[in-house]
Amino acid sequence: EQEIRSFGNKGAVLAADILDYMIRRYADGGEDALMHDALAAAAAVCPQCLVCHDYFVDVECQGEYTAGHTMVDRRGRTGKKPNVSVAMELDLPVFKQWLKDCLKQCG
């Protein structure tokens, strides 16, 4: 992204290079660029970026339903009390602004 690159610091230029690569990588697959690490950081320090819902979540290791998969009871079928807040949506404008603010400060 040119705006990020224009910040002119090493961190912003590196982030712009990574973003350019991710956009090219996913261009043929119909997906937007995925920014897993930045989103994980935002979840920790900018929770207003996310819309979360409380669900019962468990890892099924017995092979009864799956083999080592994370199971999220989104419909309340287990009757078990929610034990995890799960990020379900991203407020993209808030996330983008947070990321830009962080990158402006990189030296």
Question: How would you name each of these model-derived features?
Answer:
Residues 1-107:
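Conformational coupling and interaction surfaces
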